[in-house]
Swiss-Prot record:
Interacts with GNAI1, GNAI2 and GNAI3; the interactions are GDP-dependent. Residues 1361-1381 have a biased composition (Pro residues). The modification Omega-N-methylarginine is found at residues 524, 633. The lineage of its organism: Eukaryota, Metazoa, Chordata, Craniata, Vertebrata. One of its GO terms (biological process) is negative regulation of signal transduction. One of its GO terms (cellular component) is cytoplasm. It is found in: Nucleus; Cytoplasm; Cell projection, Dendrite; Synapse. Residues 223-390 form the PID domain. Residues 409-428, 442-528, 620-644, 842-942, 1102-1169, 1227-1318, 1347-1381 are annotated as: Disordered. This is Regulator of G-protein signaling 12. Keywords: Cell projection, Cytoplasm, GTPase activation, Isopeptide bond, Methylation, Nucleus, Phosphoprotein, Repeat, Synapse, Ubl conjugation. Residues 1187-1209 form the GoLoco domain. Residues 914-923, 1102-1117, 1151-1169 have a biased composition (Basic and acidic residues). It comes from Mus musculus (Mouse). GO terms for molecular function: GTPase activator activity.
Length: 1381
């Protein structure tokens, strides 16, 4: 680089130049030289320590041949293309320079290099293998021709120069303009300029005023404004800077920033982003400048790939006050600032009020029919920003490198949030830099530097931008900010816009030269003397840094064949569909980027939007961003005079790969899960930009239709503009009992469009709205304050705006309350997930209610006129709120984004309403409604939302994923396929066998629920569900006093006493009077031990007092005969049956649990005693005392109905007396009775006939105490896991009321009370069964203890406990009365 004095080494002479052949290997940063001029091209600069320097190339050498192709008369562009196509060793034939080293392209092109006055003939491109026609088309598309015209119009007309400018390549260097600025384009050979002259020229900035009347025309000063654009500020977040993988960290940092801003629900404030010559300012309409960021602090910028309205800006700051001087000691921090451009503000009529408020006049944009200050996307903003931070001095580059390095100098250890995958940014020490060659500006720099086409010295994988030869936009050759003349704007047309709006070039409002104003003259002089085209003030270290940046471009950008690069480097990314898949290839053939793409992008950037955006860090809190995170007030980096174009290399190189990473952000943000909502403000409101901080990141968001769901999160207004969004939002409000709000808003919206002259229509609609929503007797009243209430008389003079105030109130209510909850709801998350996966949007009736509110368990079909009733009843169950809370916490722990985590449940009462409101009330066999549901008894979280989850049509069920996730007891999980036609038990049997689990000793739960599932349901309803498998303890219990044995399945963590006490109590026995021991042992069993110690054991309960057992047994044997006749004949028993149902509804009797914890324990114990007494009175009539006790029980049960409905009465509070239980023979009577009692489901009643649910011998057929409920709802049909063991299957199905061979009809069986608790729970679930929902055992205690079988004390184990499955067992259809799991 420091070769300013080299002309002295090679004095020009008459002797012909020495020709030699060299081979240059490509280094990390390219070959290490830059080109200028053409026919032949001349090396304008050779970087110290580069491959070109090692082989002896010097500035001024002419290139005669490249890879055996003669390029002596080839154009500059063709030479650059040839170099760009070479990916390995470059073979060149060069002629050592004989003239001034600093010769420039304009001299050579104009023939000045050899003292001629006209252009040299050019070598035909065909000889070089380059399609000339293609290049012409590219030039036309990119605006190159316009640029030439623009150049010629800005130059003086005297002499042959105008013609030369038209004919020469666009990639001319700045030297000619520099000379022209000094001598009116007729300057002598540049070699005649001394270093002092050049320095003076640069210090005058005259290089930027070529063709202008005077330097004053530009009026350059430090405060000059380049552009200003109105953007919305979302928030800022500090980024980590301690990792080692640049690509990964870039993606993670941006993604993390977006995610946190979404989670914090930022409110977005409108600010004017002003890009000055060396800083970015944020200005509000009230507080003025609230933040200012020097260019030195800018690291890079990035656009959200799925929605280009959103963009981020990363800035740096040190922790110490020493600024850059202490960069080694101070810890460098980086922050990401996220902004949004709202295209809705693009049209002038919409934003003119905002423009007035901010105090500027709009600049018309004839290309887009909008205004430049209000861009339609974030790309124009980023283009100007990238221009600003590309120009940086070496010192700043070092600091920036530190921000993205992990301490060592390895560029690959870059951990920056920016992502230049391999820019030598990290190697910012001088030695390292010298090895980095000035590379082409790949996607963006190409246009900047020369023809905007290919790399001057073979940089970015053959991409190209010419070296630093003058940028092709004639007048603005001063590669001022981005190394490009003003970053030629993405619109070629913008090039003309500038001339249209600003008049002659001399009056351009975007003078890049101003950026240079901060460079000391000494630096500028050094720059000018370093190399010919760089005489524009570029210091040596700037070129070095520039080169390092290009080197990185080369490796990170590699062979993108479409000129696509990050907006950070200034180029406009094409549609994602047009980005080639090989863009990510790191090595291989370096395909040449189409010149047209680069030219077009650069021409647009240079003269495009006159608005700039910048990050703001020190923004003060305003009313609009009180919720936004505080911006870091980090110590400002000392502004350095060495802020030069070196920044451009750093920024651009890093930006190439950051765009790659951001491309991956499309899916990353969604995969991160929680798409939360935000408190948003109206996007057109005065002080805020309504946009959700949750950036909609959907991979398919390429077209409006595909990104429809994501756009709902942008603003509430956007949601209301989409009919589909309104539909889903309405469904959400319906679940929230506030659908009247959206209905009212829609009605008012329609009303406001009624013509004012149509009084009849206005009057009709006004009265309709008033009567439906606003009057005191409104059917669906909306919640508005008293000030907005309308009087009846106002309806006499209706006008379209009469409901505006009320509509605005409801609008704000929905926007700031319902809308934010909608964005957090599972319904919206399901829609987003479906959009990401390319599926059709889910049925809103299928998705559970929003987790945001615990009361939102209403039916999707619920009528808006009954919200209060529904909400009141939905809360009736005491376990409802508790379980919902558990569900919510579970969702927070797991995240609600996974398909199978949607196990939210809905109370039974609500589900009943779901059907009732739509005539789906499940009538029982003879027409009655399920009383238990209608009365809203205890809700169960285990069954929450079970019916809703399966209301979708069969067609949609087929489309849904047919699998579920089962979490096993050992902590592992597996995915199990579910198929229609196979029961849950059949599906699980294979799973249990594979994992060596006894299928009969497990229960299956929904994750987040505590109720076991009924395993005889069709397994297809578990699709996408998250399930939990829990082991249970199986053991046999012998009740010696009554000569009975039962098989039990219990929760292993329960103590023995807690499991046995309720069982023996149901048989009328007292555990305290019994001796508990294991079979074969004489020592009493420790009742405090966990029940898991009894797994597979036989437990014997013996009477300590043998006489009591005899009496009890004898009396119980005879009791059923009397009870049977009494029940069949006595009308009082019909009353008893009815009350039994009431008791069952309220308190379905449990198997498990000690009643000692209840305040009513004394009463319960008395009841048990009375039951035992009643059992003793066989063949005796009920006396007066007993009748009184009976009526007392009845009255208490009736009085407890209210408590039950309010969730205050626990089911264990009441125990059904034995004399109220029907004997087996009465089941026929119950089945044939005309009016079935409420509480019995249709399926329960018809279970015997339709499903063939046979009863096991002891459990049902021979038990006189079996209640109607238990008789009609066989445990085997609905029990979780199974009701009875295979051993009990020896009883074949038979008609109701019949007994199996060998049964003893007169033998009493108190265990039916135990079964009563379980069967009633399933009986209550029958409506869900009809609705296709998942059935769960609703009794809270059933999960802890389950009756597996019952028999005589001499019965073999096989009849009581299911044997463990053998490998030969194959799952088959469930047989009633069997218990195979």
């Amino acid at each position: 680089m420091y070769r300013a004095g080299e002309p002295g080494k090679r004095q020009p002479g008459p002797a012909p130049p020495r020709v030699r052949s060299v081979e240059v290997a490509r280094g990390r940063a390219g070959y290490g030289f830059t080109l200028s001029g053409q026919a032949p091209c001349v090396l304008s600069c050779v970087m110290r320590g580069s491959p070109a320097d090692f082989v002896g190339l010097r500035a001024g050498d002419q290139i005669l041949a490249i890879n055996e192709i003669n390029v002596k008369k080839a154009s500059h562009e063709d030479v650059v293309k040839l170099i760009g196509k070479c990916s390995g060793v470059l073979h060149m034939v060069i002629a050592e320079g004989t003239s001034h080293v600093e010769s420039c392209s304009s001299d050579e092109e104009g023939g000045l290099y050899e003292g001629k006055g006209w252009l040299r003939p050019k070598l035909d491109s065909k000889a070089l293998g380059i399609n000339r026609a293609e290049r012409v088309v590219e030039e036309v598309q990119s605006g190159g021709i316009f640029n030439m015209i623009f150049e010629s119009s800005s130059l003086c007309a005297s002499g042959p120069e105008p013609l030369k400018l038209k004919q020469r390549s666009l990639s001319e260097s700045a030297a000619l303009r520099l000379d022209a600025g000094q001598a009116g384009l007729c300057a002598p050979h540049p070699s005649m300029l001394s270093k002092e002259d050049i320095s003076k020229v640069i210090n005058d900035d005259s290089v930027f005023t070529v063709g202008l009347d005077s330097h004053d025309d530009f009026g350059l000063d430090a405060s000059i404004l380049n552009v200003a654009m109105v953007v919305g500020y979302l928030g800022s977040i500090e980024l980590p800077s301690t990792s080692s993988n640049l690509e990964h960290d870039s993606l993670q940092a941006i993604r993390g920033c977006m995610r946190r801003l979404r989670a914090e629900q930022k409110i977005h404030s409108l600010v004017t982003m002003k890009v000055m010559h060396d800083c970015v300012q944020l200005v509000t309409d009230r507080a003025g400048v609230v933040a200012e960021y020097p260019a030195e602090k800018l690291a890079f910028s990035a656009v959200c790939p799925d929605d280009r309205r959103f963009f981020g800006l990363v800035t740096m700051q040190t922790n110490d006050d020493g600024g850059l001087a202490q960069e080694d000691e101070g810890a460098l921090r980086t922050s990401c600032h996220v902004f949004m451009v709202d295209p809705d503000l693009f049209h002038h009529k919409i934003h003119q009020g905002i423009a007035r408020r901010f105090g500027f006049a709009c600049t018309a944009d004839p290309d887009t029919s909008g205004c430049l200050e209000f861009p339609a996307s974030s790309l124009p903003v980023l283009q100007f920003i990238s221009v600003l931070y590309r120009d940086m001095g070496e010192l700043i580059e070092g600091v920036r490198a530190r921000a993205f390095l992990d301490g060592d100098a390895d560029a690959h250890q870059n951990n920056s949030t920016s992502s230049n995958s391999d820019s030598g940014i990290g190697n910012f020490n001088q030695e390292e830099k010298s090895n980095r060659v000035l590379v082409v500006d790949l996607g963006g720099g190409s246009s900047r530097h020369g023809q905007g086409s290919s790399p001057g010295w073979e940089s970015g994988g053959g991409r190209g931008s010419q070296p630093w030869s003058a940028p092709w936009n004639g007048a603005f050759c001063h590669d001022s900010e981005a190394g490009s003349p003003l970053e030629t704007s993405p619109n070629t047309d913008r090039f003309w816009d500038l001339t249209k709006h600003s008049g002659p070039v001399s009056h351009m409002e975007v003078p890049p030269a101003t950026l240079r104003s901060s460079i000391p003259p000494s630096k500028r002089g050094a720059a000018g003397s370093s190399c010919g085209f760089n005489q524009r003030w570029l210091p040596v270290h700037v070129l070095q840094e520039w080169q390092c940046g290009h080197a990185s471009d080369q490796e990170s950008y590699t062979d993108s064949t479409d000129g696509w690069s990050s907006v950070n480097c200034g180029t406009l990314p094409p549609p994602m569909s047009k980005i080639p898949a090989d863009r990510y290839r790191v090595e291989g053939s370096f395909a040449q980027a189409p010149l047209s793409t680069q030219k077009r992008d650069w021409s647009r950037k240079a003269f495009g939007m006159q608005n700039l955006f910048g990050p703001h860090r020190n923004v003060r809190k305003t009313k609009e961003d009180k919720k936004s995170s505080k911006l870091g007030r980090g110590v400002a980096l000392a502004q350095t005079s060495q802020r030069t174009s070196a920044r451009r290399s750093f920024g651009r190189s890093r930006r190439f790969s950051i765009t790659r990473s951001l491309d991956d952000l499309e899916s990353a943000t969604v995969s991160d899960g929680e798409l939360t909502g935000a408190d948003l403000k109206d996007c057109i409101s005065n002080n805020s930009l309504s946009s959700n901080a949750s950036l909609p990141s959907v991979q398919s968001c390429r077209r409006l239709r595909e990104r429809r769901v994501a756009s709902w999160a942008v603003s509430f207004e956007r949601l209301l503009q989409d009919p589909v969004g309104v539909r889903y939002f309405s469904d959400f409000l319906r679940k929230e009992f506030s659908e009247e709000n959206i209905l009212f808003w829609q009605a008012c919206e329609c009303f406001s469009h009624v013509p004012a002259h149509d009084k009849k229509e206005l009057s009709y609609r006004a009265r309709e709205i008033f009567s439906k929503f606003l009057c005191s007797k409104a059917t669906t009243p909306v919640n508005i304050d008293s000030q907005a209430q309308l009087a009846d008389d106002i309806l006499n003079a209706p006008h379209p705006d009469m409901f505006k105030e009320q509509q605005l109130q409801i609008f704000n209510l929905m926007k700031f309350d319902s809308y934010t909850r909608f964005l957090k709801s599972q319904l919206y998350q399901e829609c987003v997930l479906a959009e990401v996966e390319g599926r059709t949007l889910p049925d809103s009736q299928q998705v559970p209610s929003s987790p945001a509110s615990k009361h939102s368990i209403s039916s999707d079909h619920s009528n808006v006129s009954t919200p209060k009733k529904l909400s009141g009843k939905s809360k009736s169950g005491r376990s409802l709120n508790e379980d919902v809370g558990e569900e919510d916490s579970e969702k927070k722990r797991r995240g609600a984004f996974f398909s199978w985590s949607r196990s939210r449940s809905t109370g039974r009462s609500q589900k009943k309403k779901d059907h009732g409101d739509h005539a789906h009330d499940a009538p029982h066999a003879n027409g009655g409604l399920c009383r238990r549901e209608s009365q809203g008894s205890v809700s169960s979280a285990g069954s929450l939302d079970l019916s809703e989850a399966c209301r979708t049509s069969a067609l949609e069920k087929d489309k849904a994923a047919k699998h579920c996730c089962v979490h096993l007891p050992d902590g592992t999980s597996c995915v199990v396929a579910v198929k229609s036609g196979f029961s849950i038990k059949e599906i699980l049997s294979g799973l249990c066998e594979r994992h060596g689990i006894n299928g009969a000793a497990v229960d299956l739960f929904l994750v987040g629920g505590d109720k076991p599932l009924v395993l005889h349901q069709d397994s297809s309803i578990l699709a996408t569900r998250d399930l939990r498998l829990e082991k249970r303890t199986l053991f046999r219990l012998d009740l010696v006093p009554i000569n009975r044995s039962v098989g039990l399945k219990a929760k292993p963590t329960k103590p023995v006493t807690e499991v046995l006490r309720p069982v023996v109590a149901k048989y009328g026995l007292d555990l305290g009077s019994l001796l508990v021991r294991l079979s074969g042992e004489k020592e009493p069993l420790d009742l405090g031990a966990p029940i898991s110690s009894l797994d597979g054991q036989r437990v014997i309960l013996e009477e300590r007092d043998p006489s009591r057992g005899k009496v009890s047994t004898d009396k119980q044997k005879g009791a059923p005969v009397k009870q049977n006749s009494a029940v069949n004949s006595s009308p009082r028993n019909h009353l008893a049956m009815g009350e039994e149902r009431t008791l069952g509804k309220s308190n379905s009797i449990k198997i498990r649990g000690e009643n000692g914890k209840s305040a009513r324990d004394p009463r319960l114990s008395k009841r048990e005693e009375s039951i035992a007494k009643i059992g003793k009175k066989k063949y005796q009539k009920i006396n007066l005392d007993e009748a009184e006790e009976f009526f007392e029980l009845i009255s208490k049960a009736q009085s407890n109905r209210a408590d039950d409905q309010r969730g205050l009465l626990r089911k264990e509070d009441l125990v059904l007396p034995e004399f109220l239980r029907l004997p087996a023979g009465s089941s026929e009577l119950a089945l044939s009775s005309p009016p079935p009692v409420k509480g019995y489901s249709k399926r329960a009643v018809t279970g015997h006939g339709q499903e063939g649910a046979a009863q096991t011998e002891e459990s049902y057929s021979d038990s006189p105490a079996t209640s109607p409920a238990s008789a009609q709802s066989p445990c085997s049909a609905y029990s979780p896991g199974s009701a009875h063991s295979p051993g009990s299957a020896h009883s074949t199905p038979g008609p109701p009321g019949t007994t199996q061979p060998g049964e003893k009809p007169t033998k009493p069986s108190c265990v039916s009370m135990v079964q009563e608790g379980t069967t009633q729970a399933w009986r209550r679930l029958s409506p869900e069964m009809e609705a296709g929902g998942i059935q769960t055992v609703e009794d809270e205690q059933v999960a802890d203890l389950t009756l597996m079988g019952e028999g005589d004390i001499s019965s073999p184990n096989s009849t009581l406990l299911p044997p463990p499955p053998t490998p030969q067992d194959t799952p088959g259809p469930p047989r009633p009365g069997t218990s195979r799991f």
